[in-house]
């Protein structure tokens, strides 16, 4: 065996060993996705149960408190865009490094991603604390509702660094091949929030009654618990190494995907700001009804979010290991599940949606708004899931711009203009119709684009491999 053959054999062995260490490059595709998705679903469902419990607690306070949460939601979802973007960028780079067997780079990226999350979270928290009142006023909140929204956000902004770090920590664990831990830790944090909520809101166990601010304190402390658990697990598995060398290059690699992902995530809050402003024109009770309905529907939608979040590290590792057929299989399975879950959600919301809303608030207008929401939107969330899966696929393969384009087209080109026009003709029902139509149309386009992109990128990488093989053969001769 000559030197070239020996080097080629050793490289193949290294790639095989690296792929074996990365947990998603071997074994049943469906089983990996089920394990990833099921544990994430447990975590996200528990998180949404906590949000629903929060709505129940605040419904006991007043309808104004529920409306205040509706005005706070576009702001909190904006912060989630930063957390999700940093997490998506880190997940893409880390998963591909895991697939290629570069563990040293993985540990550096994990550490540097968390430092980035802390810095960004602190800056956002300070900015939000300064400008929260102006933003909420611009959304249309007035009087008692405005005061309650500010009370909630003042506490929430203090916990923004904890929030970002907990979301990024979950993403890092998934990217490094841990399927169960992120979901379990997320569920633990949510249970803490459910338990602390009434204590702070109603003043149980000798704690001062804080009202809506108590809901924010419960959330902040629950995120702190999650951070402690994530950090302990990353340290125990030796996935963290306090080395600052190379941090700028790590941040550049993370933000190559994470930057466009943040912009993509910010576009959705922009649409939420517009939609909330449109709904506010119909009264605070309509905003409250929309807020309650979205919290109930989000419980079902988070299953699809779990699927799209889980497929990202799977695609990243297998793309790094050049297992292209496994990537195609994963996309087929998750897209099929998304459509099936959309149909199931539609039927479920028709059967129990109105009843769940009545447990939170018995206001007649709130109930009517929620009923219209459940009749129109849930059937389209399967297509929303397909769009999210396509976005995750692009990011996992290191192609952030298509994901950004999808978000821009969905929100700026289609959704917001359509919602404004529909609101003029059919009121808040028209806004719901615009949401559903946008989900279906953009979901189909995103699926087709992602399918073509995978085939084209695979063909290009196969061509590059063929050219490299020919160069090696010419060197041998």
Residue spans for each PLM region:
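Hydrophobic transmembrane alpha-helices of multi-pass small-molecule transporters
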Residues: 78-81, 193-198, 227-231, 299-302, ...
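Small-residue-rich hydrophobic transmembrane alpha-helices
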Residues: 66-126, 163-177, 181-182, 289-347, ...
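Transmembrane helical elements of multi-pass membrane transporters/channels
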Residues: 35-54, 155, 166, 189, ...
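Helix-terminus/linker motif at the lipid-water interface of multi-pass membrane proteins
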Residues: 45, 49-67, 136-143, 199-210, ...
